Amino acid sequence: MKKIVIGCDHAGFQLKNQVIATLKDAGYDVLDVGTYSEESCSYPAIAHKLCTKIQSGERELGILICGTGIGMSLCANKHKGIRAACCSDVFSARLTRNHNDANVLCFGARVVGYGVAMDLVNAFLEAEFEGGRHAARVDLITATEEGNFDALK
């Protein structure tokens, strides 16, 4: 089973706990990096905690939940080696792994309910990167991240 790391801000707290329980019941190894209450908190700090677990290799994939998923995805994508996608439909959650080799799924607790959230999570976790023509495009994302804009010419 894949090693998953999950985090949320105050808006995603209840949904995060539901997702964790379901993933653990399915046998996933889940690390919770917070937040641990509904008290208002800074989502960039949670995104940073999660991203460092993936960057270090301690965890393979991450899930971030905030109100819309957008703030978390913006923060996560500032971290080297992180490819975070904000998704609210299963097609995108699957293809972001297949084509973009995304390693963090973001969604909003104010956008999707538990049922859709689990559909997104399952699609994301079950999908694999297809490589091939997509690998060259992911390499260009990495080049951009490293400031090698000449690779884009």
Residue ranges and their predicted role:
Residues 29-40:
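A short beta-strand-loop structural module common to alpha/beta enzyme folds
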Residues 14-15, 41, 71, 115:
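Residues that form or flank phosphate/diphosphate-binding pockets in enzymes
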Residues 5-25:
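Glycine-rich phosphate/diphosphate-binding loop of Rossmann-like nucleotide-binding domains
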Residues 5-7, 11-12, 90-153:
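C-terminal binding/interaction regions
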Residues 46-86:
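Helix-adjacent hinge/juxtasegments
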